[in-house]
A protein has these predicted regions:
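Catalytic Walker B motif of ABC-type/P-loop ATPase nucleotide-binding domains
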Residues: 50-53
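H-loop/switch region of ABC-family ATPase nucleotide-binding domains
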Residues: 85-86
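Hydrophobic anchor residue at the start of the ABC signature
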Residues: 39
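Helical segment within the ABC ATPase nucleotide-binding domain
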Residues: 65-77
Length: 135
């Protein structure tokens, strides 16, 4: 493992909304704080590809905004982020390319604009073909 300098580590912790000066056992962290710590761990080694599985789960609104801002900054720095999400808003906001999976296999790959146009059409078609919809 590469040595990570303390200033860099503090910056990452601040970017994900954790106080680097606070000394607290991780087992006492809330779910959201553990999620933020996991994101910090994923990005701290400055790898070319960052893999994040549902990174917004367990975060409050401020935490979600902080993480989204950080991911956009990392993307602008040229880092590749593999984001697993079921949240269409996150996908639309953060992704350039979409890989749709089913049964553990990639079914199709699309650019976000193509996906957005076709996804919206398929939702409308799906609901317009139903006789009874209960909400």
């Amino acid at each position: 493992h590469n040595k990570v300098n303390k200033k860099y580590l503090k910056g990452i912790m601040l970017n994900v909304g954790l106080d680097p000066e606070k000394r607290k056992a991780v087992k006492k962290y809330s779910i959201g704080m553990k999620q933020r710590l996991g994101i910090a761990q994923a990005i701290m080694e400055n790898q070319e590809i960052i893999i994040l599985d549902e990174p917004m789960n367990g975060l409050d609104i401020d935490g979600i905004q902080q993480v989204k801002k950080l991911l956009v900054e990392l993307k602008e720095q040229g880092r590749t982020i593999l984001l697993v999400s079921h949240n269409y808003e996150d996908i639309e906001e953060l992704c350039d390319v979409i890989y749709e999976m089913s049964m553990g296999k990639i079914q199709q790959k699309n650019k976000i604009l193509f996906w957005r146009n076709n996804y919206c059409k398929s939702i409308i078609t799906c609901f317009s073909n139903r006789k009874n919809i209960f909400i």
